[in-house]
Structure formats: structure tokens, C-alpha cells
């Protein structure tokens, strides 16, 4: 598929301190956060003018789903716009608390685990053709997804009975099976629940729930662009070596705990291979595929270059090669500098605080954003583009239709209902348009609906 629809959903961790002590429950904090949303949307599950969906997920986790994007950099921009939308809600909620005499600070974390060991996710969505055999897609993709954490993980300090250690992935500990239709109870690598949000005869939606939430724009870019390339190879029937793992769930944990990328995991055919070996295999195939099909674009070259440097950095233990571009490395360098300066062990509470503060989305407080201000991290988008994406949908996908419809309905104060595929005016005629093609950004039926308001 030369043109693909992408989407990212991020759940955010919420906490509130009251003069340093937690006072409000996550449920109460979530209510404060979403009060503004509920006042105009009459619900804590709304679609926005930029085509995105914002809602309160299970367990009081705010979740932001980007609009449909057909370009990876645009996707990164809209993912960041989600952070800004939530940061706006946070500032508004803090002001409300203050007005009510509650001296509280609200924190929103774009990470995947809280101190109690609960996990929440970052889900990637890739539109794939209905034509192929899904089981083959999963077979080829799972070894890639299990091992890619060594280049796209967000990093985490893990407390173990033997002391603290650094893991490359936050999410790996919480994945329990390879392919499944559940997302919460038994967390799989690929979720198969068949909701394409598109013409089900043509498409299905690949729902990858194994990834970490990334702060780094370049890491998100690599995560999505590399997966897209692997999908393209599968779709075009490129012959891949059988890298099926004997036990992918054990492998994902073992790989996460090994920052050298060298730990061998057992494959189903009895061979052993490391995360570096397996990723190198996919990278070599991808480079060859891009050259042979003449698919090269600046973005693909940037992704392949970072993929290669990421593997080289891990293999040679020369993390400086990617210490501005890969989340787990950026964070590790930050932690190591702080430890050296203050003479602290990895298990010290101040280091755990640092680990968490990296994911704070408040731009005046979060450590990732302090690094960004100093020019210490690489970027793929700009603050201006992110600001625009808070209110302007992608112009080349169905999100444009949804965004335009919502904008006009709100301006005209009309009652409406939307989801990913339906646009409905709640008037006497109950006019509804079904938009089954996510690639279609112009539709006369929608235009008539908008003009008729």
C-alpha cells in the first residue's frame, strides 16, 4: 500500500498533588480536567475540530486519538497537538482548583506505567488491505515488534528484588500474548478486533498495542515509518526469513531488560538470535526493498538512517550516535548525568522522580521540554505546525470532512453527532452521511450537509 492511513492513540497518566501530598482521587482529577470538555460537548467522549477524538478511558485515563493521517510527519505533529490540547485542559483545571481554594497541582504523564504498576498504552493504527492473509502479516510482524524496542523504547527504571535496573521499554512487562482481540485484560502485541472504521470489504485496521508512548518526535517518526516499511514488504510478498519466536512474550521481557541488545532469544526453529540480529535482518530487507522499488523519499531516508544508527549505537555501545533522537537513550543520558553529579544510586527516589518528570507534558515543567528548549533533542515538526494542528484537520484524509462538519455545526450552534465514519445532524430530518473511505477528503454529500446548516 503506497498510501496508508495512520493513527496514534495515547492514554495519559494522571495524578494530583496537594502541597506535595495526594488529595484528590484520579476520578476527581479527571472530572476537573474534562469539565470544560463536558460543558461544550455534553460528554467526556468528543471529537474535535481537528478531527481527533478526546475521551476519558477506563480507569480515569484521558485518551487522545489523532485524526486519520496519510503522512508520518503529519501524524507526529497531530500526536504532539494532542499533548497541547491536554496541557490546555490541565492549566484550566488547575485554575479551577485554585478558584475553589484547593492548592493542588495536576500532572499529566505521557508514559505507560504508574507507581502502582498499572499500565496504559500507546496504540498505533495502520490501515491494511483486506486481501492479504492476516495470520501471515502477524507472523512476520511480531518478531519485528518484539525487538524494535531497542530503538524506539521510552526507557524505564525497573525496581527488582536485586536492585534497580534500566529497561528499554515501559510496556514490555505488561504484554501477555502475541495476537488477541482484547486490549485491557490480556494485553497482546497485535489486537485483532476487527473494526476497520472504513469499508470492511476493502480494509482492515492493524491495531498495534505493544509500543511505548514517545516524547521524542524523531522516535515516533521512526516507530511508525519503520513499521510501515515492514508492512509494505509483507503486502508486496517480499520473502522474509522465518524469525518466529518460540515464546514472544518471554522474549519481549528479556529484550527489554538488556540495553546491549545482545541477549539471545530462542526462535521456533531452534535457532537463537539477538534483538540486534533480528532488527538488522528487517533493516537490510527494508533498504533493499526501497532501492529495488525506487521508493526513496526524504522521510524514508531519514527513517532508514536513524534505524541504522540506532542499531549501530546499541551494538557499539556508543549511545552518543542517537542521544538526541531516541527516547530511551535521551532519558538514560539525563539520568546518568544527574547520578554522576549527585552521586546517587539508580534506585534512589530522586532518580525515579526524574524518570517520571521526563514524561510530564507541561512545557514549563516537563524534563523532555526543558531539553527541547535547550536544543538538546532533534525534531521533525515545529511549534507552529503543532499549534495549527490543534484546530486544523489533515487536509488529505476523511478527517478534513469531519473537522469541517464539526466546525460549521459549532459555529451555527447545531446539535450533531459524529464518530469515525458517521456525520449526523440531530434535527428533524436526522440527516446522516456515512464516510467509509478514509482517503477521501472531499465529498459532495458532506458539503451539502455543511451548506444546509
From Swiss-Prot:
GO terms for molecular function: ATP binding; ligase activity, forming carbon-nitrogen bonds; magnesium ion binding; ubiquitin-like protein transferase activity. One of its GO terms (biological process) is modification-dependent protein catabolic process. It catalyses: ATP + [prokaryotic ubiquitin-like protein]-L-glutamate + [protein]-L-lysine = ADP + phosphate + N(6)-([prokaryotic ubiquitin-like protein]-gamma-L-glutamyl)-[protein]-L-lysine. Mg(2+) binds at residues 9, 55, 63. It is an enzyme of class 6 (ligase). Signal peptide: none annotated. Keywords: ATP-binding, Ligase, Magnesium, Metal-binding, Nucleotide-binding, Ubl conjugation pathway. Its EC number is 6.3.1.19. It holds the Pfam family Pup_ligase. Pathway: Protein degradation; proteasomal Pup-dependent pathway; Protein modification; protein pupylation. The active site is at 57 (proton acceptor). ATP binds at residues 53, 66, 420. It comes from the Bacteria. InterPro entries: Pup_ligase (IPR022279), Pup_ligase/deamidase (IPR004347). Belongs to the Pup ligase/Pup deamidase family. Pup-conjugating enzyme subfamily. Catalyzes the covalent attachment of the prokaryotic ubiquitin-like protein modifier Pup to the proteasomal substrate proteins, thereby targeting them for proteasomal degradation. This tagging system is termed pupylation. The ligation reaction involves the side-chain carboxylate of the C-terminal glutamate of Pup and the side-chain amino group of a substrate lysine. The reaction mechanism probably proceeds via the activation of Pup by phosphorylation of its C-terminal glutamate, which is then subject to nucleophilic attack by the substrate lysine, resulting in an isopeptide bond and the release of phosphate as a good leaving group. HAMAP family: Pup_ligase (MF_02111). This is Pup--protein ligase. The lineage of its organism: Bacteria, Bacillati, Actinomycetota, Actinomycetes, Propionibacteriales.
Amino acid at each position: 500500500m503506497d498510501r496508508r492511513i495512520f493513527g496514534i492513540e495515547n492514554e495519559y497518566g494522571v495524578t494530583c498533588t496537594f502541597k506535595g501530598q495526594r488529595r484528590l482521587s484520579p476520578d476527581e482529577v479527571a472530572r476537573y480536567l474534562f469539565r470544560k470538555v463536558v460543558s461544550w460537548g455534553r460528554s467526556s467522549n468528543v471529537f474535535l475540530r481537528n478531527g481527533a477524538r478526546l475521551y476519558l478511558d477506563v480507569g480515569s485515563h484521558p485518551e487522545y486519538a489523532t485524526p486519520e493521517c496519510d503522512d508520518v510527519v503529519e501524524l507526529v505533529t497531530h500526536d504532539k497537538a494532542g499533548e497541547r490540547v491536554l496541557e490546555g485542559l490541565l492549566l484550566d483545571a488547575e485554575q479551577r482548583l485554585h478558584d475553589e481554594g484547593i492548592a493542588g497541582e495536576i500532572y499529566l504523564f505521557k508514559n505507560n506505567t504508574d507507581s502502582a504498576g498499572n499500565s496504559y498504552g500507546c496504540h498505533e493504527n495502520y490501515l491494511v488491505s483486506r486481501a492479504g492473509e492476516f495470520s501471515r502479516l502477524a507472523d512476520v510482524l511480531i518478531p519485528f515488534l518484539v525487538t524494535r524496542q531497542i530503538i524506539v523504547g521510552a526507557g524505564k527504571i525497573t525496581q527488582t528484588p536485586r536492585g534497580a535496573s534500566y529497561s528499554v521499554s515501559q510496556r514490555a512487562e505488561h504484554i501477555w500474548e502475541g495476537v488477541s482481540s482484547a486490549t485491557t485484560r490480556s494485553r497482546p502485541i497485535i489486537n485483532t478486533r476487527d473494526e476497520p472504521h472504513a469499508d470492511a470489504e476493502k480494509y482492515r485496521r492493524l491495531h498495534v498495542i505493544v509500543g511505548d508512548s514517545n516524547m521524542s518526535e524523531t522516535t515516533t517518526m521512526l516507530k511508525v515509518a519503520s513499521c510501515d516499511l515492514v508492512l509494505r514488504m509483507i503486502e508486496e510478498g517480499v520473502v522474509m526469513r522465518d524469525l518466529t519466536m518460540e515464546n514472544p512474550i518471554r522474549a519481549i521481557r528479556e529484550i527489554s531488560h538488556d540495553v546491549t541488545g545482545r541477549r539471545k532469544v530462542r526462535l521456533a526453529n531452534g535457532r537463537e538470535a539477538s534483538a540486534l540480529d533480528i532488527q538488522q535482518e528487517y533493516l537490510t530487507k527494508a533498504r533493499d526493498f526501497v532501492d529495488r522499488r525506487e521508493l526513496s523519499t526524504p522521510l524514508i531516508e531519514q527513517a532508514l538512517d536513524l534505524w541504522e544508527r540506532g542499531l549501530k549505537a546499541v551494538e557499539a555501545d556508543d549511545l552518543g550516535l542517537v542521544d538526541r533522537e531516541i527516547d530511551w537513550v535521551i532519558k538514560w543520558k539525563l539520568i546518568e548525568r544527574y547520578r554522576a553529579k549527585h552521586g546517587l544510586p539508580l534506585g534512589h527516589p530522586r532518580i525515579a522522580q526524574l524518570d517520571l518528570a521526563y514524561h510530564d507534558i507541561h512545557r514549563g515543567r516537563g524534563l523532555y521540554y526543558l531539553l527541547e528548549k535547550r536544543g538538546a533533542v532533534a525534531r521533525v515538526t515545529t511549534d507552529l505546525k503543532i499549534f495549527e494542528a490543534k484546530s486544523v484537520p489533515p487536509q488529505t484524509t476523511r478527517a478534513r470532512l469531519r473537522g469541517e462538519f464539526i466546525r460549521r455545526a459549532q459555529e451555527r450552534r447545531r446539535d450533531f453527532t459524529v464518530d469515525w465514519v458517521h456525520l449526523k445532524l440531530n434535527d428533524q430530518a436526522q440527516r446522516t452521511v456515512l464516510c467509509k473511505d478514509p482517503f477521501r477528503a472531499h465529498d459532495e454529500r458532506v458539503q451539502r450537509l455543511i451548506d444546509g446548516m
